C-alpha cells in the first residue's frame, strides 16, 4: 500500500520541526511554553479557565435536544439490575467474591460480598459490609472504594479497605473487621497517599507509602519499604529497603500457592526493568531470579504446591536453558529461596504459537491443584487448564465453553484466594450480553447470571478483517455493524489504545466509553476496534514492535485500518471518528494532527499530549520505558515527530477535537488536555474542552458522572459525523 500524501507531508514537516525546535521543546520548554500555568492543577487562573471552557462545551453539547434522552439511556444501562460488573472491579478472598454495588440510592456504592456460586442469586445473596455513602457523609469526604485494592489478612478475619478521595490513585487504608462489619478502632490506618501494602502476619504489614515528598520517585510512587507493627505509627516503622528516586516504584507483594505464602518485594527501575527481592528485618535485600511483569506489584504471584506460575515478558535464560517470551513457566520457590538454582528450577507450562498470546491483565487463577488461564487466538479467547502430572510435568488441556459462548472474550476473576474451590469466568463480545459462570476445581462451568441488554443488538453482527502493513505485519480489526448494511455511508466510530502490551478485546462495554458503541449502533453508526502493534494481542513481540523510537508504527497501523475501511467501501474519509482514553487519548491527538484527511471527529480522554514534558508531570516518568526519554536527544526526536501538542500548525486543517479530563486525575496530568485545547483555540482551530472536578483517571466514579460524560461524547459524534455538518466546522 502506498503511503498517503498527508502522511508524507506530516513526516517531512515533523522532521523539520524536530531539527529547528528541539531546544524549544525540551531544553527550554519551561520558558517557551505559554501555557505552563495550565499545569497548576488547583491554580485559580487554571481552574477559572477550565470552568469557562467546560461551561462553553456543556452549553453546546448538553443543550442539544438529544442530550437528555442519551443521558437517560446511558444511566439506564449503567443502573440496569441485570448489568454485570467489570471483572476488574471485583476481588475474591476467603471463599467470597467482593464488589462495589452502585445505584440510584447508593451512588458511591455498597461494599458487599457473596459466594461465587451465589453471584447471580439476587440482592438477598449479597452481604453488605460498608455503606460508602454513609461513611463519606459522616466524615465529610468524597470517599470511593476500589475493591481490587482491598488486602485481606492471612486468617481472613480482617481487611485493609482503600478509601479514594474523588477517584484519585492516592488512598487511605483502614483496617476492617469482616465478622463484626466495622472498622477496627485503633487498627491499621494510613494517611491519604500513594501506597502498596501486603500482610506479613495478623499484626504486621509490609508497606511502601509516600509520607513525605522525598519518599516518592519522580513518577510519584513510593520508593521506601517499611515493616509496620500493630500499635505503632507508620512513620516510625522500620525501613527495610529503599530505591533511588529516578526509579519507578518499590512495592511489597505476596507469592503464594495452595500450600505456602511468602512476602517479597518488587523493585521497578522501569515498567520493564524489574527485580524481585527478599527483604527482612536486619538483613540486606536478596535478589531472586524470578522473571515477573509489572502487574506483580498489584496482583502478586500465585502457584501450586512449591511452584509459582510466571508469565514471561522477555526470553529467560536459566543456566543455559532458555524459556521464550510470552510463555508461562513454573518456578520452584523453595529452591529459589534456598539459592539452589539451575535450569531444572524452572519448567515450561505453556508456550503460545504464533497466533496466540496470554493477555497481560489476566494472570493464571489457581483452584486447588489446577491453574486456569485465558489464551487469545487471533484475539479470540480460549480457556486452558494446567495440572501437574505424576511425573511432575505440566499438562495443559482445553476447557470447553458452553455453546453460544465462543467467538468473544473470556475474563477470569483474578483470585487472591489460593484455597478457593471455585471462581468466576465472564464471557462477552460486542453484541452478546455478558454471561457469568462459576468455574469449579474440576473445570466445570455453571451459569450463575446473564446480563440484560438495554439495547436490542440482534440486528447487528461482528466481522474480523486483517490488513497487511508495508513492513509485512498482519494487523486485525473488528468491525460491528447492522446486518446487510455494509456500505460507505454509515458513520464509523473507531476506538483504540496501542501501548503497554494491553490487548483490545471484544467487549460488551468498552474501556473509558462503556456501552457507547451500543448506543452508536442503535443510532445508525458502525464500530471498529483495531488490534494494532503496541498492544498485547500477539504477545511481547507485538508490544515491543512499537515502543520507543518505533512508536510511529502505532499511528500508521490505525491510519492503515481507516484506509482499509475506505478501500473496502465500508466508510469514507471524514466520516470516521476516533475515541481513546489515556494512551488512547494520545492516539486521538496524533491521528487528528497527522491524518486529518481521514478523521472527521476526535475524542481525547484523560490524554497524554505534550510528549516533551510528559515525564515531568505526575506519573509520567514511569512511562519512559514505553515512549522514550525527552531529555535524551536521540529519544526526543521520534517523540517530537508525533507529539500532538508540538505539532499543531496555524494553517492545519484539523477536525474539531473534544478533549475531556478530570481535575482529580493524579496519574495523567490534566494539563495535557488543558494545554492542547488552549493551543488549538489560540491558533484559530475549533476545539471543545471539558474537565470534571472528580473522577480520577476514569473521569467519573458514579453512574451519573459516567452517563453525563457518555452523553456529551455521543452528542459530539452525532453532530460531527451524522448531522450533515462539515466535520471541520463547529456545530451551531
Outline where the language-model segments fall.
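Polar, glycine-rich mid-to-C-terminal structural blocks
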Residues: 223, 227-267
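Non-catalytic accessory segments flanking enzyme active sites
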Residues: 48-151, 162, 249-268, 273-279, ...
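Blade-edge beta-strand/turn elements of extracellular beta-propeller
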Residues: 126, 178-190, 232-244, 282-290, ...
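Serine-hydrolase catalytic core recognition
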Residues: 87-89, 409-732
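A conserved hydrophobic secondary-structure block that centers on an alpha-helix together
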Residues: 129-197, 202
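Short loop/turn segments that connect beta-strands within beta-propeller blades
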Residues: 117, 177-181, 229-233, 280-283, ...
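Structural motif
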Residues: 105-112, 168-174, 215-226, 270-277, ...
